[in-house]
């Protein structure tokens, strides 16, 4: 006889958790109690919850569990960055912890692999398998907080790990609610950031359901170049994307009225001075601060990192237009934890890895 599948309480945001306990015949406040144990104390053992009566504890042990992804590998960088490979149903996703003097940021994955095939991203070359569940997203935060320890182990969360978060809103939104909930991690909405490559319809849905900080992966100042390095641009071009961003900003209080624009600098591809002028002009109607990200190379990729002088010139052009510009300091590159380097272990349903390998070997995909 098969045992009944237990409910993983990490899959439930506060509303769902309260509904779960009401269905058990309990008062809604029980949900708040349990959430505090899970998220404030990092507890995954019902027996340790000493303000919950024994009858309820025994019942919970029979029908529920608190199960976060387990760490399969840990790497520590010389700069303090930590990268974990976490097991999610026979595959792996990567999560990165970035400590600084005044904050501690966790970079969280939303999918196993990624469906979008951006040319400069290591994750994209692995193809795509599936969306992560709520428990597998908030579970990354839970696991990291438990390992790091301390009173406020994580102050900021960025949904910038593996995957396109807006293609998994059904799970990403409840997970972000838990990050911000006072009975969860209590992180300010200004310190929870979602990043997107431009899934415009989902951006409109996001703005109707939750308010968090927004970052956009732009990476090119015109449609021709952007389509070459980011195929999603063929579906949602720059004009449509930025219009969607402005609609989101009109609904949001978490962004201070402007979006963070991420722009990876690829040597002699998108980093010429004309590109900087183009970028300033294309963003003139969209209040922005710009993060310039020098490319982080990975094996098998044709792109290079620009020289410091090219990066500096590009940055100065944008500042002359009045933009706030930050050149992102590369963190964790000695353990492949920098932007665009996350890989994990993906069973590729899109067969992208195989196609890329065949093309490199001069084999036609159509022949196969």
From Swiss-Prot:
Identify the EC number(s).
2.1.1.192
Name the needed cofactors. Answer: [4Fe-4S] cluster
Q: Name the residues that span the membrane.
A: none
Query: Which top EC class applies here?
Result: transferase
Positions annotated to bind S-adenosyl-L-methionine: 163-164, 195, 217-219, 296
What positions does the domain Radical SAM core occupy? 100-334
- Write out the catalytic residues in the record: 94 (proton acceptor), 339 (s-methylcysteine intermediate)
Which keywords does this chain's UniProt record carry? 4Fe-4S, Cytoplasm, Disulfide bond, Iron, Iron-sulfur, Metal-binding, Methyltransferase, rRNA processing, S-adenosyl-L-methionine, Transferase, tRNA processing
Q: Which HAMAP family match?
A: RNA_methyltr_RlmN (MF_01849)
Query: What name does this protein carry?
Result: Dual-specificity RNA methyltransferase RlmN
Q: Which organism is it from?
A: Aeromonas salmonicida (strain A449)
Instruction: Give the gene name.
Output: rlmN
